[in-house]
């Protein structure tokens, strides 16, 4: 049924009604609110769905997360902690808290500077008869005075003008060959022949010598010895230290513990020997790696071999009558007392090869960390008379040995900007002024870890001033460019390394409010993720001391590293972690700095023992300490699944980092 149509008058009445309602203000407000509500709802609904969909984690992301958690070195996300309060100190000693806060504010203002803000004054090194460190305090005071004077010269710029290098563009001559007579060589200091530009592929050394007759060892006629050592040394690799032994060749004519003639070969870097290669008269196994297709060890006739004059006669007879059967020739030990020999050492593609009297004796593969151009010195020592030395096929171009030239001035290696606020771990790296290549290797290896590049962990080199002015000028430039060096203003000395450790504690605990302080050396490779995981094992808030611990060690009273009773009157050392790598909690670091600046910190020349002593004092007077021991903080060299690896050359540092990136597991670079 159709609805009746409205008349024209009725339509006009409805329009008038709507118009009158619209003119009412309340109706207009209600309609505006309704329209706004519709707009908000239409916008919110897609966002809700999007948020819901993004909260659903896909399976592949979960699997990646699970894989990361199962890895030995997860990329730990470190959330910045609130400013650390010195809660570990007794409440009854409020002066420490107040003073620490003041010092912390002072240090934070200057922590981006080059110079350490550790406070030295005239009373810092006053000798104290209480702890037997009179001589150490005297030398520290002298070093501080010299360093302060030198730093003022550096700051003023006068030193840079005084240091001139007239021969900067004049390279050393690179002769194609070098030769010396026996008398010339034997009269040289340390029996050393310099090879100005090192060796190159194909270089060879020919030495004519005569082993001396065996003599009693230390006057004991039951122990006769006759041995000599030929070494290739890296004279320009380090300064002020024993040069690395790139090749150590040591024939022992009377043998050693085996009582059989033996040839031992090895390499040594910073007093750390690698795995020895011993040739004892047995030919290398067929499945053993060769060096340029040569075996590492050739066979020679031993005393227990069945090789008589009759067998030699039969061999010659068979040769004369034309027997087709091939008879293998065997030779005696290549060196005989009081008999001349001609030794040739040649540099191959994969290693060094040694021939004696025209016969191959042994080959030694190149070790990671050294190159041919590093071999700039030849030494011969021991029970031998040298008749002549001839070195040929030397490089004619001059390689760069200046350590500072190893610096790669690229912004890629500069320290990242550290935001305000505390960091999780501060790593202080002990370094010497002239260790330019060592610092560069650290920058290009483990300091590229994501935790350091993201500034969640901060690493800095701590360097004292060097005895050579030109080194200090270059060092200051390096510090200003890379922004990762803290100069401690005293003249560097091995006995005063402990001052750098105090500076590390001060810089880490006060300048960066770090929760933990780690100390290591510039030849230490740090597997950062593994160290962090080890720290996380200690309950939150506990004072900790982590490293390769030594218990009940006694001081050496004789020899090169002797410790006098005046220096250390006690019979035992306290428990201490080996110096190449250890971790302290920040409350211990603050304790050390406070004692030092109040002139109450006992100093000892052995840095790692000093830290153990300070930690024990903290434990006895302030808070319990959680000691954690692990052999993976390596004192000597590198071990499987290391946390830190020590005595690593710059090339080994790069090798360790490359292996860690490619294989995601710690693998040593002891070999080539």
Swiss-Prot record:
GO CC terms: endosome; Golgi apparatus; Golgi membrane; trans-Golgi network
Record note on pH: Optimum pH is 6.5.
Entry's EC annotation: 2.4.1.-
Matching Pfam families: Gal-bind_lectin, Galactosyl_T
Transmembrane intervals: 29-49
Tissue: Expressed in juvenile leaves, stems, cauline leaves and siliques.
SUPFAM superfamilies membership: Concanavalin A-like lectins/glucanases
Cysteine disulfide links: none
Pathway: Protein modification; protein glycosylation
Disruption phenotype: Reduced levels of arabinogalactan proteins. Defects in root hair growth, root elongation, pollen tube growth, flowering time, leaf development, silique length and inflorescence growth. Increased sensitivity to salt stress.
Main location: Golgi
Domain annotation Galectin: ranges: 191-392
Membrane topology designation: Single-pass type II membrane protein
Subcellular location field: Golgi apparatus membrane
Protein name: Hydroxyproline O-galactosyltransferase GALT5
Source organism (scientific name): Arabidopsis thaliana
Name of the encoding gene: GALT5
